[in-house]
């Protein structure tokens, strides 16, 4: 750690402390898990804010290792239905402890949010507001296991003040299925909680050198699963292969040995993945049962690869100006045009990157989310009591004191008395600050 980093840890700030609860569905490669990618981009875009992130992780994840993060080990089962059911109350209580502070909980796993809040509020001193991010719903037409967790997901959402969701299409699907189980008052509450947040791209990630050169590669960089219509895509590629044999199909997430002469599943690190996308002629965005945002599509577009897209509302939300198909023949006609007409392909490449830059700038979404953070924290109840004034005087006299010291030496109350309102009162005081570090420290600053 360099001197600058040491100094940064001692700088008084009005730190916002966020506890992040994970949702891991791709344990084969945690760095590529969609939750990890989303959270990493959030932290990067909010790096200039005074936020410290405490992240529960099944193992250390390099991609979430920043100056303003810590990772606490929290094991989760790998099978999704087991992962959504398993919650170790006593281990969670020990992890969050009394020595840490949390102004906000961000739950990426709605199915656990009730257990999470129940444990925090009833077994610890913490009572923070809860915000969420929904990565997955067990929709009736998608769920492949014998018993779904949809109702548990909805009950978890109802514990939140706000929960972000990828697309309006997906939100509509949630509300529609929820009507089968919940009354209209609850549906209205869900409608208020669920907030569409598009997963845009960072401006600096958009290709700036517009080169029309490319290879005749069709990329399918989605998960090769049934809910992404992978089988139907391969059948379409078989038909295209019957027409012409001058192309390859790259499916980077395909495991095992490719079983077609045109298939490749080359693996790269993230930069290598981006570099490979730059060489592709066209990407394929399939019909999907889930209605979510396609990070795979924006990955390709920002690297200069245009995509043809299934004519679904979720893709129109991403870019209404793309080339859409509804039938196999329409898809084949479009693929042939992109493979043969370099000028047209280059035109669509340019239009796509311009759209990303002007309409899907992730920084704008993150500024809105940060304001949501501030609004929720500002609405957290604070105390105004003799004990509050006593704590203020202690911090003033000591100059600085850690949360552990303050709690052990001057509080001494049971878990029935909640700390969060006292922290809120301290942080609202004009002369009291925290530090951007894993250990909370209250600092008196007259400036």
Q: Where does each model-flagged region fall?
A:
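A short, active-site helix/loop in glycosyltransferases that binds the activated sugar's phosphate group
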Residues: 158-193
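N-terminal subdomain of nucleotide-sugar transferases
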Residues: 1-62, 238-240
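Nucleotide-sugar-dependent
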Residues: 285-298, 309-319
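Conserved donor-binding/catalytic core segment of Leloir-type glycosyltransferases
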Residues: 18-21, 164, 209-228, 234-238
């Amino acid at each position: 750690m360099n001197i600058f980093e040491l100094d940064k840890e001692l700088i008084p700030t009005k730190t916002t402390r966020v506890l992040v609860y994970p949702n891991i569905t791709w344990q084969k490669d945690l760095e590529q898990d969609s939750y990890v990618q989303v959270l990493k981009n959030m932290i990067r875009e909010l790096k200039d804010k005074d936020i410290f992130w405490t992240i529960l992780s099944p193992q250390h994840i390099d991609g979430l290792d920043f100056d303003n993060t810590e990772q606490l080990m929290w094991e989760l089962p790998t099978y999704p239905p087991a992962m959504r059911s398993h919650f170790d109350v006593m281990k969670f209580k020990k992890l969050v402890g009394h020595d840490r502070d949390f102004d906000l909980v961000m739950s990426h796993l709605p199915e656990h949010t009730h257990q999470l809040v129940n444990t925090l509020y009833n077994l610890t001193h913490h009572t923070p507001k809860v915000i969420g991010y929904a990565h997955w719903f067990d929709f009736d037409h998608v769920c492949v296991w014998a018993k779904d967790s949809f109702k548990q997901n909805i009950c978890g959402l109802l514990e939140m003040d706000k929960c972000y969701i990828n697309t309006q299409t997906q939100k509509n699907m949630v509300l529609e299925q929820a009507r089968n189980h919940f009354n209209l008052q609850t549906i209205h509450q869900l409608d208020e909680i669920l907030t569409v947040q598009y997963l845009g791209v960072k401006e600096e990630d958009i290709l700036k050198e517009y080169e029309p050169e490319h290879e005749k590669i069709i990329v399918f960089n989605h998960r090769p699963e049934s809910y992404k219509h992978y089988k139907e895509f391969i059948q379409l590629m078989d038909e295209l292969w019957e027409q012409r044999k001058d192309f390859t199909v790259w499916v980077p997430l395909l495991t095992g040995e490719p079983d077609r002469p045109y298939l490749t599943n080359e693996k790269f690190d993230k930069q290598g993945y981006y570099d490979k996308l730059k060489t592709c002629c066209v990407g394929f965005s399939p019909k999907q049962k889930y209605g979510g945002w396609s990070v795979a599509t924006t990955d390709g577009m920002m690297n200069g690869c245009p995509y043809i897209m299934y004519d679904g509302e979720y893709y129109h939300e991403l870019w209404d100006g793309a080339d859409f198909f509804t039938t196999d023949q329409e898809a084949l006609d479009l693929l042939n045009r992109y493979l043969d007409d370099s000028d047209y392909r280059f035109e669509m490449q340019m239009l796509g990157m311009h759209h990303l830059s002007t309409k899907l700038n992730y920084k704008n979404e993150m500024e809105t989310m940060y304001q949501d953070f501030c609004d929720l924290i500002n609405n957290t109840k604070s105390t105004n009591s003799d004990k509050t004034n006593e704590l203020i005087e202690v911090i003033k006299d000591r100059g600085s004191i850690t949360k552990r010291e303050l709690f052990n030496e001057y509080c001494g109350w049971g878990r029935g008395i909640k700390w969060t309102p006292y922290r809120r009162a301290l942080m609202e005081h004009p002369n009291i600050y925290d530090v951007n570090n894993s250990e909370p420290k209250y600092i008196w600053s007259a400036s």
